[in-house]
Amino acid sequence: TLCSESSPLMSTHSWRDALKIYSSPASIALLLLGFAAGLPYMLVFSTLSVWLRESGVDLKTIAFASLIGLTYAFKWVWSPLLDQWRLPILGRLGRRRSWLVLSQSLVAIGLAGMALCDPQESLSVLISLAVLVAFASATQDVAVDAYRLEIAENESQAALAATYMAGYRIAALFAIAGALYFADWFGA
């Protein structure tokens, strides 16, 4: 039967084993990397559209800007390059870490630049920065997946994927709720 002791569906791990896996340094790192990947995703997809609408940008332009999200759908196109190219300066950190550092740096620069833009005055700059953020974030997503596969044994992969997704979802909530909070705070 499905619930017999010999069933492959029955777990042989205790709560202590689960706690050990989910509190490991690798799990905590993946939780933080998930947060770092989820935040720009939601900012580019949801929050940007709301911001543009609140700024009076026409709906056709907002619809066009939503195409930025396609970078996440097509990340498979450039993902093999992350395996092939070794970054010149950051390469000493290792292949995965160097791509993580580069992509996170580009995300931070892009988000900071977006925060300084006024959609009414510099819409093209804002959209260009959003494309940069989306591309760097999608690249970061690829690098994190490869990093996760390299740092852990097979039996830990499910826990690491779960902590990554938990961080991703927490970031999504933070991006949406945080945007609403700051909009209220600044009276936008």
Name each model feature, range by range.
Residues 83-84, 115, 174-188:
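Transmembrane alpha-helix termini and helix-breaking/packing motifs in multi-pass membrane transporters
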Residues 75, 159-179:
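Glycine-rich segments within core transmembrane alpha-helices of 12-TM secondary carriers
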Residues 84-104:
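Cytoplasmic membrane-interface "Motif A"-like loop-to-helix N-cap segments
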Residues 100-120:
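C-terminal ends and interior cores of transmembrane alpha-helices
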Residues 13-72:
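Helix-loop boundary and gating motifs at the non-cytosolic
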Residues 59, 154-163:
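Loop-to-transmembrane helix entry/capping segments in MFS-fold secondary transporters
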Residues 139-152:
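Intracellular juxtamembrane helix-capping segments at the cytosolic ends
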Residues 35, 110-113, 121-140:
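Hydrophobic core of transmembrane alpha-helices in multi-pass small-molecule transporters
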